[in-house]
């Protein structure tokens, strides 16, 4: 995966740490979702066996799942064909008083193929791109959402978040109208 670092402090050591952290984070999610192999970070942010016995606890320990569910919904609502693995901002801050102690999905930055084509009733965020799209534009499937979209506990979280948003639809529409 390729990520752009948006920070004023990016020494070579920091860039290497961030690259390693993101590789390990994705591996942790993959291992938990696909292989039922539960890992965690040690003090040096290396992966080690975890004491967790399920995928949900393993991933929730290191990712802000509410933010992931929110981002999933944004890409699903927009039918974004370009959801890719990095079409949104993510952050994590390991400082003592951090607002983002877990990997947090913040906001999208790239909607170059939103609302592409006719709605087909399929999932967009957690699905592989349609072969005809891939043939022309390349595969822009989102591996984070594909892995998590296969987890019932995550989809329950997404459904709950969607239900909550529907209850507050008036506030959403008012915000849109204000813009």
Specify the residue positions occupied by each region the protein language model found.
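Surface-exposed patches in mature extracellular/periplasmic domains of secreted proteins
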Residues: 35-39, 80, 88, 171-175
């Amino acid at each position: 995966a390729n990520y752009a670092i948006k920070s004023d402090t990016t020494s070579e050591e920091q860039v290497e740490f961030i690259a390693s952290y993101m590789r390990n984070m994705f591996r942790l999610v993959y291992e938990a979702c696909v292989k039922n192999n539960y890992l965690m970070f040690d003090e040096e942010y290396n992966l080690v066996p975890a004491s967790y016995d399920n995928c949900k606890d393993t991933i929730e320990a290191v990712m802000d799942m509410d933010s992931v569910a929110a981002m999933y919904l944004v890409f699903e609502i927009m039918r974004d064909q370009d959801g890719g693995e990095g079409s949104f901002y993510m952050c994590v801050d390991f400082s003592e008083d951090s607002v983002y102690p877990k990997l947090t999905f913040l906001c999208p930055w790239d909607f170059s193929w939103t609302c592409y084509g006719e709605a087909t009733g399929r999932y967009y965020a957690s699905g592989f791109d349609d072969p005809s799209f891939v043939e022309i534009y390349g595969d822009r499937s989102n591996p984070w959402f594909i892995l998590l979209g296969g987890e019932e506990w995550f989809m329950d979280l997404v459904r709950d978040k969607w239900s909550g948003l529907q209850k507050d639809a008036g506030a959403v529409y008012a915000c849109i109208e204000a813009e």
